[in-house]
Amino acid sequence: MPCRGRASNRGTRSNAAVCFEPPPHPPVPPAGPARVIANRTTGPSPSAIETAAALPGAAAAATPPATRVVDIVSGPLQVRLAQTEADIDAAQALRYRVFYEIMGARPVEGAEQQRRDRDRYDQTCDHLLVLDHTRGSGAEAVVGTYRLIRREAAARIGAFYSAAEYDVGRLVAYPGEILELGRSCVDAGYRARPVMQLLWSGIAAYVFHYDIALMFGCASLPGTDPDALSVPLSYLYYHHLAPPALRARALPERFVDMRRLDPKGLDPNRTLAALPPLIKGYLRLGAYIGDGAVVDYQFGTTDVLIMLPVSALNQRYIQHFGPDGERHAA
């Protein structure tokens, strides 16, 4: 959900690298059935999924089955998980271009010299990649990325990334597997529908393969003045606050109260329409909002926490991307 360690809304320019935003509605599947085929392996990953997307020209990629947790091909485009250190490096290079060169974030020490956006989570998580094979077969082919952190990966580090801003104890206690989405971005000229469908098909295949029960991550409102964001913050609190058992709260030292206006004075329809596409898209999928916002001065944003139980997913999304592929024909 989930840019950088978050699902971000930054980057709406069509002529520059941009952060990935989910569509405002679950995408309508193209003609043709989607298939999900489970393959058991003896490699590091206990099982894998090979997904043939319901897109024109879709076919299984020529990747060894042991690496196929996600592998979807449509024409020259492919979405799969990173398999090598070179794949991860390519994702880090793309993230640097988006977050620091385009969005103007302040690089951490060493990032500017290396021209890479890196942190300690990169070697433990899964990286979802979109590749355009017309650009080549190496790092230059990577045009989109999304970072996926499950319990096992977070345990090796000691915490989820969002724990730097929020008390995620209630999320960690959630029964079943949980997934933090972040560091999402798409390169210039690749925001057309096929790329977005590939990304969401890849996330869906991953979610169903690992039986994910809960997804979460941070999303951003532009600007660092909470008073200037009183309308969207108040709307999110009064209309989309998570139920108590799921309600993560911003850390005390970073907590910004979202209850800034009388809810009677809000226009829900107009406010929802004006929200950044990322947040609006997740709300339409059935997401909740945590308690409290967090100002991120490094990136010039005010963050909110998105929580999306898979059980609450909009049924149209399930129908489009769920595991029962044979019912996905248009």
List where the protein language model places each region.
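Conserved N-terminal entry element of GNAT/NAT acetyltransferase domains
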Residues: 33, 37-85
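Short amphipathic alpha-helix that is part of the acyltransferase structural core
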Residues: 68-143, 147-153
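Short hydrophobic/aromatic beta-strand or adjacent loop that forms the aromatic wall/cage
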Residues: 125-127, 301-305
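Acyl-donor binding region in acyl/amide transferases
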Residues: 148-288, 293-303, 313
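Long, contiguous binding/interaction regions
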Residues: 318
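Short, cationic low-complexity segments
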Residues: 324-330
